[in-house]
Amino acid sequence: MNAYLHCLSHTPLIGHFDPNQDVLDEVAEVVRAARARIEAFNPELVVLFAPDHYNGFFYDVMPPFCLGMEAEAIGDFGSLAGTLSVPKDVAEACAESVLTSGIDLAVSYRMQVDHGFAQPLDFLLGGLDKYPVLPVFVNCVAPPLPTFERVRLLGDAIGRFTRGLNKRVLFLGSGGLSHQPPVPELAKVDARMADRLMGSGRNLPPEERDARTQRVVVAAERFVENQNTLHPLNPKWDRYFLDVVEQDLLSQLDDLSNAHLSELAGKSTHEVKAWVAAFSALSAHGAYTATDRYYRPIPEWIAGFGSISAHTQR
């Protein structure tokens, strides 16, 4: 087995507004078991596909995909802050390979990432710098968005590159499943917030970041009382999506439009594209077997919360 995968939902609300203790314990056991499997695999390289939430990427320049040559986690919502351990030579070679394959991958030598990257590194690996990691941003919240097909091809291109490294490679996908938290939309905000989305939102002062956290907490409290205050979770679609990735039927999603996905499951459900990229990268290493599937809708976290592992069959 030269390639392993784990995909996991993230939520900024952990520790800020939590479900009952039995649910917390259940999720904690899922994460603990996944972390133990990853430790047993002992990856030599990690490729992490994750979104951003207007913390590192803004409308001044909004690429569909970006690979970090260097990356720093900002520590939003109490997540880990600090420097990711990016092997620059491997990242540069990966970018060249992916571009040569026909995927227009941007690069950043000053990438900033938020909880979407930090949580899986913390929960599944034990820290930001425990393993060499290639951080791959996938734009999942700022229209215009990449399609499922392009994300699948991105993952395949990265997987074909890592296949040639002769290393044990771990692919991580972060985000989803169905959810629509109160993320600002450029077409619907006032001039001040539009300016934030266009770039002035970098390095927010602590009081403004705290206010953002509190807005999300209040939205979650209201959502628990009435799921019509935001787009409702869609467990049926979430389970369908888990079936797709579990059975390596990724191309079935190619014709699902961005607008239809938003209508079905919420505008932030596009974060599942990070999972599609990760599974596509794994598939480039050979046929895979998925294991340890978990799903629970958790209104307190405004998320259909999912987790799944997979490994190549050779």
From Swiss-Prot:
Cofactors, names only: Fe(2+)
Q: Which GO terms describe its biological process?
A: 3-phenylpropionate catabolic process
- Which pathway does the record list? Aromatic compound metabolism; 3-phenylpropanoate degradation
**What UniProt keywords are attached to this protein's entry?**
Aromatic hydrocarbons catabolism, Dioxygenase, Iron, Oxidoreductase, Plasmid
Q: Specify whether Oxidoreductase is a keyword of the entry.
A: yes
Give the molecular function GO annotations: 3-carboxyethylcatechol 2,3-dioxygenase activity; ferrous iron binding
EC assignment: the record states: 1.13.11.16
- Tell me which Pfam families the record gives: LigB
Q: Where are the transmembrane segments?
A: none
Its top-level enzyme class, in one word, is oxidoreductase
Keyword Oxidoreductase in the entry? The reply is: yes
Record family assignment: Belongs to the LigB/MhpB extradiol dioxygenase family.
Record's function text:
Catalyzes the non-heme iron(II)-dependent oxidative cleavage of 2,3-dihydroxyphenylpropionic acid and 2,3-dihydroxicinnamic acid into 2-hydroxy-6-ketononadienedioate and 2-hydroxy-6-ketononatrienedioate, respectively.
* Subunit composition and interactions: Homotetramer.
Cited NCBIfam families: PRK13370.1-1, PRK13370.1-2, PRK13370.1-4
Name by which UniProt lists this protein: 2,3-dihydroxyphenylpropionate/2,3-dihydroxicinnamic acid 1,2-dioxygenase 2
Which taxonomic lineage is given here?
A: Bacteria, Pseudomonadati, Pseudomonadota, Gammaproteobacteria, Pseudomonadales
